UniProtKB/Swiss-Prot annotation:
Similarity field: Belongs to the IraM/RssC family.
Protein's name according to its UniProt entry: Anti-adapter protein IraM
Keyword Cytoplasm included in the entry's annotation: yes
Keywords: Cytoplasm, Stress response
Gene3D superfamilies noted in UniProt: 2.40.50.650
InterPro entries membership: Anti-adapter_IraM (IPR014448), PmrD_sf (IPR038679)
Record organism: Cronobacter sakazakii (strain ATCC BAA-894) (Enterobacter sakazakii)
Length: 111
């Protein structure tokens, strides 16, 4: 099945990412996965059994949970992760939260 990434929110406290995806039929899911990969808005995601491709490239995601989209739950996720500037689409030159952040790789800074 093919999906489009609507939005992603990094959880700096848990080294994970929450991503909202939508199917061509407008069915929406929330993915919770380990932050070894970051899905950006507009990415295309294809799931076929155990294989996952992003923008036609195979990737390995450690999925913790998948749940049906609920607007209130999604807003709770967004509102609970406000200390990461990248979650607000702000330019991140130097992260002020880095000492407390549990992410091993920041998707918002150049490396």
């Amino acid at each position: 099945m093919n999906w489009r990434v609507v939005d992603s929110v990094v959880s700096t406290d848990t080294n994970s990412v929450f991503t909202l995806i939508s199917s061509q039929q407008s069915f929406k899911l929330i993915l919770w996965y380990k932050a070894t990969f970051y899905l950006s808005s507009g990415d295309t995601l294809s799931i076929n059994g155990a294989s996952i491709t992003v923008n036609n490239h195979p990737v390995e995601l450690t999925l913790y949970r998948t749940t049906v989209y609920n607007a209130r739950f999604w807003q709770t996720i967004v509102n609970s992760n406000t200390h990461c500037a990248g979650n607000h689409r702000q330019s991140v030159g130097r992260c002020g939260y880095r000492r407390k952040c549990k992410l091993l790789y920041c998707p918002f800074q150049k490396h």
